[in-house]
Amino acid sequence: MLLRTSLSQRTLSPYRELASYHLNKSGRAPLQSEVESRLLHRVEKFLEGRRETAESLLEEVDVWMWNDDSRQLELMEVKPDVAARLRAAELARTLYEINPGSARNRELHLLSQLEYLKRQSGASDQIKVDQFLKQADNISASEVEGLLSEAIKLDLIHAATAACEVLKEVGGEAQIVSSDMRPLVNAILVGDRHLQFAAFDAIAEINPKIAYAGSSYVAEVAAWFASSRFVKKCAVGHIRSEVAQAWSIATGPRGWGSVSADSSKDFFEQATSDPDIGILLISDSLQRPSQRELVRQLRSHWKTRRMPIGLLARDADHLIKSIRYTEGMDRLLTFPLSLDDDAIASQLKQLEGQESTWTVSSDDRYRHAARSVEWLESAAVDSDLDYYHIGSHQKQLLGLLYHPEFTSSAAKILATQPTAVAQRTMLGFVSQGDLPIEARELVADAFEDAVKRGGTMLTTREIQLQYERYNASENQPAETQKVLGRVLDVIEARRNQLKQ
């Protein structure tokens, strides 16, 4: 405190002189350059999590914080990582006050504030942007963009996420539209789910009307989020189905679903298309590509590069080789192949420990999906946003029809897609008598819009099938016959229009 008071440019001169007097009285007052150098080193270590403290061993830490509103110190219980970043924020603030003219001092001060604020708010809630802007001395959107870039470079995921949340409120098209990918788009490629969503959400809020580098990633991540089923899963790759079955049985009680593949190609496709997969298990039985090549491919892909991977070794010789291969590699562990429930549960627990410090909850998955569906609907009907080519993600969007909360939006999206697959899917939905009639009527509306936009894309056989469905519905409720008759009227009206 005396050091800050004696060196801070914000301290009134009499107080600075008094603090310097007491420092000299107690011993030699350090030079400003010495203080800056030491603080700089400590801030960087705290920020990057390289400075271990006694509190690191505790689950909760008591810290005293000054509340500007109440004008008094308040006791808070926080997690050790939050306490470490709080300490970094305090030190960085001192560093900045000592020499506010240093660009690096300001950058570390603001980065540490972002890192701390995000760890304090948690993954599911946005930081208090006004609080950050108040501390940031008229920061510009361009400077926030620079902070995002530096946070990505330093792997400060929380700070990067917070920077995206700030850009959502203060950013503009200049932070997105470019012939080179801007940091907001690059943030999607880092591979952290919460950071990906924060970047997407900011871009969706800014809503540029001009094509830009990396726009395809934005549309893809939106369709990926939207296809979530809100249940975390692990993916198991092995040529024997009983291995996947054993993992499915053992992981269920721990809240995990399970999917499997018996080839490297299918495993990669599954891992990069299912947004609910969070842990990967790869057996050395998979070939073409080999287990190690598959790992390299997954580490290179923006959806899977940060996922924990467990390598399953078939015997002791392969286990030893795999342990040597994974030594010192982040989020990569080796296990002996086992069908035992307890052994699998233990392996899963170790992989969970390799996950991001903030997990993705079912509520998070739903929130990400809902925001993405909202944006996809608006992008699909806005001709200014045609450059996103929403139709190229049609396969992932078809299933949204069967999710009650998203049926209406999915129908409107599919209505803009002049494809046989979209029309066939809508007719299949309308024809299912066990679905709510209100939802079927919504999709019938969308089918009519689709035909008006691009004509009928169905084959003669598919149209005949629809007549058969109508004829078979004579014993079903009247509203079912009505909605089935309506889509036939739409088809016939189009036919008659073409004959004229």
Roles of regions detected by a PLM:
Residues 34, 41-91, 115-142, 178, ...:
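Short coil/linker segments at helix-helix boundaries
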Residues 5-14, 135, 150-158, 186-194, ...:
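Short coil turns that connect the paired helices of HEAT/ARM alpha-solenoid repeats
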Residues 1-7, 31-40, 141-151, 174-187, ...:
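Amphipathic alpha-helical scaffolding segments comprising HEAT/armadillo-like alpha-solenoid repeats
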Residues 230-252, 280:
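Conserved acidic segment of CheY-like receiver
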Residues 279-306, 312-321:
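Conserved phosphotransfer microenvironments
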Residues 255-263:
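Short hydrophobic/Thr-rich beta-strand motif most characteristic of the beta2 strand and flanking loop
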Residues 262-279:
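Acidic, metal-coordinating helix/loop segments flanking the phosphotransfer/catalytic sites
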Residues 1, 14-26, 131-136, 158-175, ...:
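Structural detector for internal amphipathic alpha-helices that build alpha-solenoid repeat scaffolds
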